[in-house]
């Protein structure tokens, strides 16, 4: 009975020694245990190779714009539920989060030289006064960039003068806009040719994505800055 105590101590020492040896073998010695564990948990049998994320540039563009160009992305509203977005040089000019969009036409005026936002407003083209829109776009200065995104209905209140002014800004489709069409457009005061930055989706019960509305439009690209001389 007197040997029971010493035997227990010897047994405990042996167990501790064996445990230390086992841990050393498994973990590879001091300082390398964590990498060994990580290698086990990330072995081919236990790991899934993650796809590398594609790099995004200003406004989420897949490629950077050249020097002296402005990066932009415009998304029209979806039906009468999701508001439009206008992004320029990684700055959100208009969106539901900024609480500055509304039914109708959402328009941001930008200095074509500096890229600075001049003014942003929404114009109700269903129940609003079209004269408010005319007062906004008639006095534009040469070289001003005009970003437009529709939401719900862009055209019911449009008159001949409104369509003509947008056409003079470079639009091909302003003359044909109708009730609940989707429209995104970038034009400029003083352009000689039609803008390459425009999309138009007709409201048609045969092709509408939503009940009573066409699908939302999304457009992105690079706009050359205007020279100071115009």
From Swiss-Prot:
GO function terms (MF aspect): carbohydrate binding
Record keywords, A-Z: Disulfide bond, Lectin, Secreted, Signal
GO cellular component: extracellular region
GO biological process, one term: ATP biosynthetic process
Residues annotated as domain GG-type lectin: 68-226
Pfam families in the record: ILEI
ATP-binding among keywords: no
Keyword Membrane attributed: no
Localisation per UniProt entry: Secreted
Positions of disulphide bridges: 59-87, 65-222
Residues making up the signal peptide according to the UniProt record: 1-33
The family this protein is said to belong to: Belongs to the FAM3 family.
Protein name (record): Protein FAM3A
